[in-house]
Amino acid sequence: MMNILLINGPNLNLLGTREPEIYGNKTLSDIEKDLTKVAKEKSINLECFQSNHEGEIVDKIQESVKSIQGILINAGAFTHTSISIRDALIGSKIPFVELHISNIFSREDFRKESFLTDKAIGIISGFGISSYSLALEGIIGYLSIKD
């Protein structure tokens, strides 16, 4: 069975209440339940992890090296600031898809720079919560071809 890790960064625990005009009304728990169901239907084990703390995300990536085949990451604000998450992803050698609910390239200038994009196998951005299912499809397709 393929194991995929979903990582959500800071403030994504506030989905459903934080700026619903940008991020929608679904909670992170709703998104995780829906995505886990889709993964299970495809015989994929999806592990979900969220943290507001950069070091915890780095630790989770490092702990996953032997058990996870692919990572989906919505690093939130850490997308634009975290060299340590970038380095952990590179060091893990686990293929990853960067995802964002909003189109980060059509927002404030500081959100247009990602420290992850050039190392990701792909990026999904701007499709609302559908970005999660699109990213899952992308990583499954990539890993299926890779094997």
From Swiss-Prot:
Location of site Transition state stabilizer?
A: 18
Q: What is its EC number?
A: 4.2.1.10
Pathway(s) the chain acts in: Metabolic intermediate biosynthesis; chorismate biosynthesis; chorismate from D-erythrose 4-phosphate and phosphoenolpyruvate: step 3/7
Alphabetically ordered keywords of this record: Amino-acid biosynthesis, Aromatic amino acid biosynthesis, Lyase
Residues annotated to bind substrate: 74, 80, 87, 101-102, 111
Q: Cite a single GO MF annotation.
A: 3-dehydroquinate dehydratase activity
Question: Entry's SUPFAM superfamilies?
Answer: Type II 3-dehydroquinate dehydratase
Catalytic residue list: 23, 100
InterPro entries with a match to the protein in the record: DHquinase_II (IPR001874), DHquinase_II_CS (IPR018509), DHquinase_II_sf (IPR036441)
Among the record's GO biological process terms, what is one? aromatic amino acid family biosynthetic process
Keyword Chaperone assigned: no
The chemistry this enzyme catalyses reads: 3-dehydroquinate = 3-dehydroshikimate + H2O
Has the keyword Lyase been applied to this entry?
yes
Whom does it interact with, and what assembly results?
A: Homododecamer.
The free-text function statement in the UniProt record for this protein reads: Catalyzes a trans-dehydration via an enolate intermediate.
NCBIfam families linked to this entry: aroQ, PRK05395.1-1, PRK05395.1-2, PRK05395.1-3, PRK05395.1-4
What PANTHER family is this protein classified in? CATABOLIC 3-DEHYDROQUINASE
Protein family membership: Belongs to the type-II 3-dehydroquinase family.
- Protein's name according to its UniProt entry: 3-dehydroquinate dehydratase
List the source organism. Prochlorococcus marinus (strain MIT 9301)
